[in-house]
Amino acid sequence: FVKTGTILPFREISPSQIYTFSEDFKLTGQHFTVQDTDGNTLYTVDGTAPLVKLRVLDNYDREVFTMTKQLGHALATYKFYQDGELYGTLEKQFDLVRDRFTMEVTEGTLELREYSGTVGHNYKVTLNGEMLGAIMDDMDLTVENAVFDNAYLIVYRPDKLPLLVCMAVMAARELARDKEGAVTNHTISR
């Protein structure tokens, strides 16, 4: 208003949904559950140990999303499949400050970028600059959070929840890899 003298319309705010993302211990590999705010399990996630393949299953045990880690790449690379079809290839980008991954999909460019939060590791997921959601560490001081990867997913487009679930597991695995001393953007910048 100050610059133009014209009242600008408010941007419509899209409501978001919050989901919990909790790891369960399994000797056979990674296992996660995704629940809504009422505690209803929406998806289960099963992955191999070490994480090479990850499957997101709905309540009917149908595979709705799959992620596979591509071995032999200098920077982390993952292939994502939706309903058995290739959705895109997520590649870690060289960035001196924060983790950043991009993927070209039919809808445009998808980006997962670490952003500064007060505590913990937080990521935002955008598609062509539009916010799809965020992945935030569960910072409650519990034994489960100290041992397992637990997070909150804030989702603006519920149809993208399985994609965000895969990205949350991938981000958690990359953080664990960073802690184990792998060469990463963070170690290069020090």
Where are these regions (language model features)?
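Hydrophobic/aromatic-rich structural module bridging two neighboring secondary-structure elements via a short loop
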Residues: 56-89
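Low-complexity or membrane-interfacial segments used for flexible interactions
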Residues: 1-53, 59-62, 85, 92-190
